[in-house]
UniProtKB/Swiss-Prot annotation:
GO terms for cellular component: cytoplasm. Its EC number is 3.1.3.5. It is found in: Cytoplasm. It is an enzyme of class 3 (hydrolase). InterPro entries: SurE, SurE-like_Pase/nucleotidase, SurE-like_sf. It holds the Pfam family SurE. SUPFAM superfamilies: SurE-like. It catalyses: a ribonucleoside 5'-phosphate + H2O = a ribonucleoside + phosphate. This is 5'-nucleotidase SurE.
Length: 251
């Protein structure tokens, strides 16, 4: 078993080291992660300059390769020639903060998993809800359990799984739930400030609160102490509207 690890918080993030510890007993691990934090990078690729790859030589990250690019860059170059042996599984995370609802469209963590999926490799993204690493040991343990369950009882068809773990002690986690994506309200307004020259600058506002957190959603599961397991797909076609748009077709 060869597992490729990536993330969006950067190669020094505690969540990546925890994921490495969790999965190392399961097989050979290759880590290719961003040099810097790329939260919110989505599926962006670096096309205007070459990418450089470095290798950490000390600490918990010893042997990790890191790239001066995005999470998608990391998985893309790993799967298209940088590493010799094709991985059996791509795992991204453990992210600092949730990736639920529309978050998956912005998340670099989920994007790294999507890139693996696009290249035909089963892929799983892990996120721990809430900022901080208060119960990272619990998330580490759950990540290993989820991957072990995937290996022993894989779902039918291609796998792209988004996992959100509540920020709780392991003993307080209520269990696992298969979920759909919930929905958020619109993001908060931008925060306007001025730089020292009096020129306006803007910070992107906070994500909106949950709009659809009904039973069966990722929001609902996590709010009730469950691990949320959401299988994703990439076909964004609105099939319900397709018939209406066909009226616009030319002869």
């Amino acid at each position: 078993m060869h597992i490729l690890l990536a993330n969006d918080d950067g190669y020094l993030a505690p969540g990546l080291a925890a994921l490495h510890r969790a999965l190392a007993p399961l097989g050979r691990i290759t880590v290719v992660a961003p040099e810097q934090n790329h939260s919110g990078a989505s599926n962006s690729l670096t096309l205007q300059r070459p990418l450089s790859v470095f290798q950490a030589t000390e600490g918990a990250q010893k042997g990790f390769r890191f790239v001066n690019g995005t999470p998608t860059d990391c998985v893309h170059i790993a799967l298209t020639g940088m590493i010799e042996e094709r991985p059996d599984l791509v795992v991204s995370g453990i992210n600092q903060g949730q990736n639920m609802g529309e978050d998956v469209l912005y998340s670099g963590t989920v994007a790294a998993a999507i890139e693996g999926y696009l290249f035909g490799v089963p892929s799983i993204a892990f996120s721990q809800v809430d900022k901080g690493w208060t119960h990272l040991d619990a998330a580490e343990r759950i990540a290993r359990e989820v991957v072990e369950r995937y290996l022993s009882d894989p779902p039918a068809g291609p796998v792209l799984l988004n996992v959100n773990i509540p920020n709780l002690p392991y003993a307080e986690v209520a269990g696992w739930r298969a979920t759909r994506l919930g929905k958020r309200h619109q993001s908060q307004p931008v925060i306007r400030q001025e730089n020292p020259r009096g020129e306006p600058i803007y910070w992107v506002g906070a994500a909106g609160d949950a709009k659809d957190a009904s039973e069966g959603t990722d929001f609902h599961a996590v709010a009730h102490g469950f691990v949320s397991l959401t299988p994703l797909q990439l076909d964004l076609t609105d099939t319900a509207q397709l018939r209406s748009v066909r009226r616009w077709q030319t002869p």
